[in-house]
Amino acid sequence: MKKFNKVILAYSGGLDTSIIIPWLKENYGCEVIAVVGNVGQSDELVGLKEKAIKTGASKIYIEDLTKEFVEDYIFPTIQAGAKYEGKYLLGTSFARPIIAKRLVEIAKLEGADAICHGCTGKGNDQVRFELAIKTFNPEMQIIAPWRTWEIKSREEEIQYAIDNEVPINITYETNYSKDKNLWHLSHEGLDLEFPENEPKYDKILELCNTLEKAPNEAEYITLGFEKGIATSLNGEKLDGVTLLQELNKIGGKHGIGVIDMVENRLVGMKSRGVYETPGGSILYKAHKDLEELCLDKETSHYKEIVSLKFADLVYNGQWFTPLREALSAFISKTQETVTGEIKLKLYKGNIINAGMTSPYSLYSEEYATFGEDGIYDQKDAEGFINLFSLPSIVQAKMAQKLN
């Protein structure tokens, strides 16, 4: 096995990366520097420095990436309206590129000769991390233990941790695979691996109440947007991080943003996960409804196509690509008039539009009213229908002729 002098480890303090530190030292004889990308995982950061050093890391970087994460990754994805396979709000997907970018920067700073990640060989994250690493340093060596070591399951990981006195906070019975950041919390594994099983929401959920425990009374909120970016909550201007934190609290209280999904992974198989995205779900709904008011028909319809491709690119780890940047440029243009306020009613998992306004609204009461007006001459509709139906008429006459 090739030896390295210094390895940068993408560290979370979870099971995978906790046991990787002693494994790297044992198998590569290298110095291990742990790097934590703080993308809003909050309480998970507590005690990480002590844990990493105790486990064998020579030092640890805890990099605050939350502001950049929200402004440069989350907000552009909301503007795009991107959902993978119509449901997944890409919480893990767009968190990986920003972390990988920082790993490369610290590797250069430290003079490291390899970067290591703890992603499974069956998952999407290995692709997301390595695409970004190769983008910023094509020559960087990458170590992916899950593709080389003898450990084949999370149960074996737990046993390795026990054998090597690595402190962990999970047991065989609570061994859900989780990923948490400011945007979402995902849950995979155990009983969720069997689609016939109903998720044990009362045991799984951390950000959100179950619908049974959500308040019995609705709550109204008002969101303000400027060029497709949420900038205020209930009339108060907030920075992106604070706004999302507040929406997570409010949405979580009402059981909003919980999805149970079977998705098609990039690497070929299907997987099932439960995702909690309370604040994000509110922002997506608000933004989409405001677009309905502000975008013209052709732009709106074409943007739906762009949104699908944008979601695929993000899901597949292709954030730092010319196509994603080009699509973002198009999306940015569409957002120039997506400004206004929207009132939402939140109730037991539901997000209900309760009214919206915009200085760029394309909705005209004068044209849309069912009452009498002096603008729209309904007689004009007959000529329009005759022209619009011409292809159908020609097709029908041809069919009659053949018969």
UniProtKB/Swiss-Prot annotation:
InterPro entries for this protein: Arginosuc_syn_C, Arginosuc_syn_N, Arginosuc_synth, Arginosuc_synth_CS, Arginosuc_synth_type_1_subfam, AS_cat/multimer_dom_body, Rossmann-like_a/b/a_fold
Coiled coil: none
Pathway(s) per entry: Amino-acid biosynthesis; L-arginine biosynthesis; L-arginine from L-ornithine and carbamoyl phosphate: step 2/3
Residues that hold L-citrulline according to the record: Y88, S93, N124, R128, S177, S186, E263, Y275
Top-level taxon of origin: Bacteria
Annotated binding of ATP, by residue: A10, Y11, S12, G13, G14, L15, D16, T17, S18, G118
Positions that bind L-aspartate: T120, N124, D125
Molecular function in Gene Ontology: argininosuccinate synthase activity; ATP binding
Main location: cytoplasm
Location within or outside the cell: Cytoplasm
Enzyme Commission code(s) on record: 6.3.4.5
Cellular component terms (Gene Ontology): cytoplasm
Reactions the enzyme catalyzes: L-citrulline + L-aspartate + ATP = 2-(N(omega)-L-arginino)succinate + AMP + diphosphate + H(+)
Pfam families with a match to the protein in the record: Arginosuc_syn_C, Arginosuc_synth
GO biological process terms, semicolon-separated: argininosuccinate metabolic process; L-arginine biosynthetic process; urea cycle
Keywords, comma-separated and alphabetical: Amino-acid biosynthesis, Arginine biosynthesis, ATP-binding, Cytoplasm, Ligase, Nucleotide-binding
Family: Belongs to the argininosuccinate synthase family. Type 1 subfamily.
Subunit-structure text: Homotetramer.
PANTHER family noted in UniProt: ARGININOSUCCINATE SYNTHASE
Name of the protein in its database record: Argininosuccinate synthase
